[in-house]
Design a protein with these regions (language model features):
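Short, conserved active-site loops that position catalytic residues or coordinate cofactors/metal ions
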Residues: 37-43
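Active-site neighborhoods of divalent-metal-dependent phosphate/nucleic-acid chemistry enzymes
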Residues: 71-116
């Protein structure tokens, strides 16, 4: 499974996004399932509605409902780790969506991610030491 950040969903949904074409090409070539978290879904819906309108938000929600990708369920015990991460990365600062993806990486045992957020996901470490591997924007 490949972890997906909000920025990937936004690139897919916005034809004028500079990463739109590369995100679509990557999506078309996938042989693995995608997985994200509820905080990422919430953030994506908010930003799609704000930037592109209700149709874009509803289209994304329809894909969630259709099972186009998996959704990791955060449990109460995960929030202790999320709070630790928010404290650790407070200078960025880190939001709930990004912290939830680190928890997901720790759960999966890998940091393979699709994101256009180069700054944050080049800094974040899962299990406090392992860097993320951004499959979308490999350099």
């Amino acid at each position: 499974m490949i972890i997906v950040d909000t920025s990937f969903w936004l690139a897919l949904g916005n034809r004028s996004d500079k990463y739109h074409d590369v995100a679509n090409l990557y999506l078309d070539s996938l042989s693995e399932r995608l997985i994200t978290t509820h905080p990422v879904i919430t953030e994506t819906c908010y930003l799609l509605l704000d930037r592109l309108g209700n149709y874009a938000q509803c289209n994304f929600v329809a894909n969630v409902a259709a099972g186009a990708f998996d959704v990791f369920d955060l449990e109460i015990h995960h929030y202790r780790r999320i709070e630790e991460l928010m404290q650790k990365y407070r200078d960025l600062p880190m939001d709930l969506a990004d912290a939830s993806l680190i928890v997901l990486a720790e759960h999966l045992g890998h940091g393979r991610i699709l994101s256009t957020d180069l700054r944050d996901f080049n800094i974040y470490r899962w299990n406090n030491q392992n860097p993320f591997e951004n499959l979308l924007l490999k350099t």
